[in-house]
Amino acid sequence: MQGPLRQLCGVSLFPSLLRHPSATITHVLSTGALRAHLLAARLAGPVATSRERSLRSYRLFAARDPRVLIGIDPEWSWNERDLIGLMADKCGVSGDPRHTSGHDVIDPERTLVALDAFAERLEAVAQRKGAVLLGTGHPHRLLGFYAAVADALSAAGCTVLTPAHGRCVDITTRFGLRTYNLDYVRGVALVREPDAKSSGCETGAHSHSPLPVRTVLAAAAESGGLLPELVVGDHGWVCGAGQLGFEAIGLADTDDPALFVGEAEGAVSVVVPLDDAVRSDYYRPLTRYVLNRACLSQ
């Protein structure tokens, strides 16, 4: 294990990063090194998401609960057993419905294959210098990943869109109807509570809702400006855009079946299975890997 981890981290072994948050990862030299990182950081392999949590999401999706559909309107009928089979195929979780407890497991090989497909879509839009939209419902963890992608696409000549900046969005939460403000940080859309600090100070609110991306895309259309050729993100940003016919790619955990259903039905282009709630710096090797694969490294 030390060989690939030493390659991954450059000067220090990955366990030192786990002990010291200020440590940095500079390069990813191989898929073997990235596979080791995925397992060491628990981005894949046994992940923090519980089997119970995932099964609950599958049941709610089968019942077409909008909290779990997050913008996807499935064309096919999906029951819980169908979803378990789909997630076993897409993520590598257990396909046995009798397995009802413990940690979910993501196959790192599936993550690597999906990261390559993700990079191919980035490379394609960069080659034609297309307009792109990036948004996240996981800003605390994933803002850095998307911001680096936005920076690289911008440097390649893509227009990074920021429509509806400051627009209010009413989102139903478990606490009732809440109003959020649309904001952009380094080209990445997110929502904030109205009393949150301005850009760059607070990372924004966690949200699964597709309403922000619908608001953003409607504003872009109303203004007569550019529409995105590619939407990059997670949760409702991917599902909401894909359902409206925009090419969308993103990241998803094992308790987010909507993105994988969208991919299976053709509404979403690429979904990368991984734990979407580990420490933000653990995504840096993925960023480097994806940008290298997409020929966007600076």
Model-derived regions: residue spans:
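Long, charge-dense
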Residues: 145-212
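Gly/Ser/Thr-rich loops at beta-strand to alpha-helix junctions
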Residues: 135-147, 234-240, 255-256
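Metallocofactor- and cofactor-centric catalytic cores in central/energy metabolism, strongly enriched
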Residues: 5, 10-137
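Amphipathic coiled-coil/heptad-repeat helices and related helical stalk/stem segments
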Residues: 115-118, 209, 213, 234
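Glycine-rich phosphate-binding loop
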Residues: 217-252
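Anion (oxyanion) recognition and catalysis
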Residues: 126, 154, 242
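C-terminal functional extensions of proteins
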Residues: 226, 244-298
